[in-house]
């Protein structure tokens, strides 16, 4: 078993995200993304891609969402996206927001 440092990797990345996936686990079955959206940052794209599904959880702070779903995503709430469904996140708050994406393959998808 391994422990993965995701928060600091996300904070120090150019995009504000860290993808914990095949490179770290050796498995194509699932992945997780830890994302940090800075105060007033907007237009962060979230899109699973063909053959993938994702559940997005607003972990810290509220997010304003546009795209496939438009409206607020309150802290502690989640949404589900499939394939080419795309959303854009905006953090209208005064402090950083954090979201977690749990992703995996759709039933018929294979790598």
Mark where each language-model region is.
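A short, N-terminal "cap"/entry segment at the start of jelly-roll beta-barrel domains
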Residues: 1-31, 44-45, 110-111
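Short, solvent-exposed loop/turn positions at domain surfaces
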Residues: 31, 52, 67-68, 75
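Conserved short histidine dyad/triad with adjacent acidic residue
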Residues: 33-50
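Glycine- and acidic-residue-biased ligand/ion/polar-headgroup-sensing regions
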Residues: 51-64
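Short acidic-glycine-tyrosine-enriched beta hairpin
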Residues: 68-84
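A short hydrophobic beta-strand segment most commonly corresponding to one strand
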Residues: 80, 94-111
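Short, surface-exposed secondary-structure boundary micro-motifs
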Residues: 84-85, 90
């Amino acid at each position: 078993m391994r422990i993965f440092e995701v928060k600091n990797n996300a904070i120090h990345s150019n995009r504000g995200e860290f993808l914990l996936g095949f490179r770290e686990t050796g498995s194509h079955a699932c992945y997780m993304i830890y994302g940090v959206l800075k105060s007033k940052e907007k237009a962060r794209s979230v899109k699973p891609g063909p053959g993938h599904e994702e559940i997005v959880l607003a972990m810290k702070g509220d997010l304003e969402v546009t795209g496939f779903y438009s409206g607020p995503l309150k802290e502690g709430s989640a949404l589900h996206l499939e394939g080419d469904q795309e959303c854009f996140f905006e953090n209208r708050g005064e402090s950083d927001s954090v979201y977690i994406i749990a992703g995996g393959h759709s039933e018929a998808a294979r790598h």
